[in-house]
Design a protein with these regions (language model features):
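Active-site beta-loop-alpha junctions enriched in small/polar residues
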Residues: 20-22, 55, 85-89, 131-134, ...
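Conserved small/polar residues in nucleotide/adenosyl-binding loops
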Residues: 287-294
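Glycine/proline-rich, positively charged
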Residues: 93-187, 194
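Short, well-ordered coil/turn segments that N-cap beta-strands
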Residues: 13-14, 46-48, 77-80, 123-127, ...
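Glycine-rich, positively charged active-site loop/lid region within alpha/beta enzyme cores that binds
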Residues: 92-99, 200-258, 275-281
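N-terminal binding-site loop/beta-alpha segment at the start of enzyme catalytic domains
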Residues: 1-81
Length: 298
């Protein structure tokens, strides 16, 4: 797997491992053995970039993902780039599967969160630390200032923003240079292409989450009933309703034809498309059954 540069100097594999699905949002939780097998396979195929967040977990174990990775990634820590996120919590009063997020970008929250993440991840620093969502009640300059302090203390080496607008990016970058923006991006969701000019101007990388549209672009799902496991966020996503699947059927059929012509899979075609867009785009992907597909792209 080739290397890409986020920001000015953060070297990562061109496809990262989005670890959320091992603990959160897809209806199943990986055992340590399953996680070890997936991560070992990813590393063997050249993946060096692993993405998590303090909020990825279960009701019983809210920080499951970081704790799991703290055990599984420990033997590889000096060989990988480890990213995590802070600054949101779930609205536990909600009864929906996909609970609303409550942003919290206060400096005191960020400083408390990094200590918990470092402990759970069994490391003395993070290579990339994001504010997970933008808290519009806190000036972004204060959030950026807290990240700058963490960098000066050696607790993080780079920082980033998730789901940020151009205005927020520019204001944050003035306080402390931003290395990466992590936003939703795929063939099915291209709104953030409008940020590409400012990212190029400021030399900021773009990390794409949900690059396979939460699995839609694998062309493997055909019925809403496939997402009925408790905690599977896809049960509430419009693209996975019976109507949504029907509307996208023609596109998925076309993807299958293209994939067959290239002796590839729809997932590989999707990732190859993304990697060809810009040299500073790095998709982070997770699929239990497609760990090989996402790294063996075209």
């Amino acid at each position: 797997m080739e290397i890409r540069i986020l920001g000015r100097d953060l070297e990562v594999s061109e496809i990262g491992f989005g670890c959320m699905g091992m603990s959160h949002a897809y209806g199943t939780v990986s055992t340590q053995k399953e996680a070890e097998e997936l991560i070992e396979k990813a590393i063997d195929e050249g993946c060096t970039f692993f993405d998590t967040a303090e909020i990825y977990g279960t009701t019983e174990d809210p920080h499951h993902n970081e704790k799991l990775l703290g055990k599984v990634l420990r033997p590889y820590r000096n060989k990988i780039v480890l990213a995590s996120k802070c600054g949101i919590r779930f609205d536990e009063t909600a009864t929906t599967v996909n609970k609303p997020l409550i942003p919290d970008g206060r400096p005191e929250t960020i400083k408390a969160s990094i200590e918990g993440s470092l402990m759970r991840l069994n490391t003395d620093h993070l290579d990339l630390y994001y504010i997970h969502r933008i808290d519009m009640t806190v000036p972004i300059e204060e959030t950026a200032g807290a990240m700058k302090e963490l960098m000066e203390q050696g607790k993080i080496t780079h920082w980033g923003l998730s789901e940020a607008s151009e205005e927020i990016i520019r204001r944050a970058h003035k306080v402390c240079p931003v290395t990466a923006i992590q936003n939703r991006y795929s063939m099915m969701y291209r709104d953030y292409e409008k940020l590409f000019p400012v990212l190029e101007e400021l030399k900021i990388g773009f990390v794409a989450f949900s690059p396979l549209a939460n699995g839609l672009l694998t062309a493997a799902y055909h019925s809403h009933g496939e997402f009925e496991k408790p905690g599977d966020y896809r049960s509430a996503m419009p693209q996975f309703t019976e109507e949504g699947l029907k509307e996208n059927n023609e596109f998925m059929s076309w993807m299958k034809v293209i994939a067959e012509e290239k002796n590839a899979t729809p997932a590989q075609i999707s990732l190859a498309w993304m990697l060809a867009k810009k040299p500073y785009i790095v998709p982070v992907s997770y699929t239990h059954l497609r760990a090989h597909e996402t790294s063996a792209h075209l």
